[in-house]
């Protein structure tokens, strides 16, 4: 077996007389003669002070750097951006959320390539920073380890009537709807506002950040057991140190990201998402990460896996528990062990430990599924996975629904069509939405939005208004991991690309059949053909800046809304 080169790229900046200037620069940041033989490890962090999701990352980056030193490498820390979905929700800022995923992946690639770093520890806390980091790892195909910031503890609120309960940020969005509908006082709304975020960490339910942290662990890109501990828990510092050591070991063993992120690993990740009832955003992000890893992952793979993996997690937004509770009952490895024992995971895939997933799980002292937070395999919440991909005349390329929270098998009703989210929110506030309506929000897709905004503001308001189980919401945009209710997103083709959603009119009958996985517009083809005559999309909202660039490059949601 050929000898492993511990410095597959950094030799460009440390070896020979031509690297004299580069070595001089590196001496100025602390390196010396004894360090030139060490692999250089990029420690990339999306730390910021803008949101609690990322507050732990500066601390964890220091731990990762210490681990790199202990493993025999030399760490070099750099930063990238992060966008807070909780802050940017419901206004113009949400156009920039999904775009940030691409900026993160591109910026990490740029630094890693320009500075000739040999491997990376990638740290993230917010929704889009997790897939952005994993996309960068897959694209670069270097030795890489991902580390999650950890989730926030749930808040506790006492309302004016004496009621006390746990709350998360999603309760705030729903409380806004209740306040507007006159069913909650401004005083209670303020009490909830003050309680939802008691400290650092990402949103606490099985929303997008925790879903993608579970994905990273199931993919094998994070250390076993590292996804579930809360942000403030000092076990995270242990995992940070171990992650730094692990990346140097991966270089020594010649293991790179694509050795880990195989088709089987992606199937494992999908299985874990289905079992937890995770965020629909996982579909979009897994497609994009797989594309970077040159893995052929299709929407059909999600339905195939959902058919055999039961939904076990009684987790918010639809259930009762949060990620802290998952940690309390054993974390992601407990779920993976149960799925593996049931023959629902590939055990022989490689992981960042340098061992297979099966070997990792066998080395851990794991409890059985607790039966409450995570239901037993023979007593699932649903017999099939928590996400389905629909097809039909209204979504020929597909649409995504979180079946974990969809209480009806069939819903049929008249369309109420809105150009973008604001118009729908105004109609709801004015009391113009009725039970049985199918709300259609279009021109919110990857290109037409642009940016494929999340519709949490409108879905929270719908639930707060008491209509959460009585109206169906369809969009070519997407939904927050915290969205509840009858919601179908990612409709493709999107409106700006002349998808069928562009030609829906008020009063058209729309039918969704969850069991059959169909979504249909009940309008005959001759009528639709007449509507297409002379049609033109809405003009672009942005003609300059990052969103204008993004709109020109982005692909369909059915392909993960990639830009490459």
UniProtKB/Swiss-Prot annotation:
UniProt keyword list: 2Fe-2S, Amino-acid biosynthesis, Branched-chain amino acid biosynthesis, Iron, Iron-sulfur, Lyase, Magnesium, Metal-binding
Catalytic site: 480
Residues recorded as bearing N6-carboxylysine in the entry: 128
Co-factor requirement: [2Fe-2S] cluster; Mg(2+)
Keyword Oxidoreductase part of the UniProt annotation: no
Coiled-coil spans in chain: none
A GO MF label: 2 iron, 2 sulfur cluster binding
EC supergroup of this enzyme: lyase
Residues binding Mg(2+), per UniProt: 85, 127-128, 454
Its job: Functions in the biosynthesis of branched-chain amino acids. Catalyzes the dehydration of (2R,3R)-2,3-dihydroxy-3-methylpentanoate (2,3-dihydroxy-3-methylvalerate) into 2-oxo-3-methylpentanoate (2-oxo-3-methylvalerate) and of (2R)-2,3-dihydroxy-3-methylbutanoate (2,3-dihydroxyisovalerate) into 2-oxo-3-methylbutanoate (2-oxoisovalerate), the penultimate precursor to L-isoleucine and L-valine, respectively.
Subunit structure: Homodimer.
The name this protein goes by in its record: Dihydroxy-acid dehydratase
Organism the protein comes from: Clavibacter michiganensis subsp. michiganensis (strain NCPPB 382)
Gene name tied to this protein: ilvD
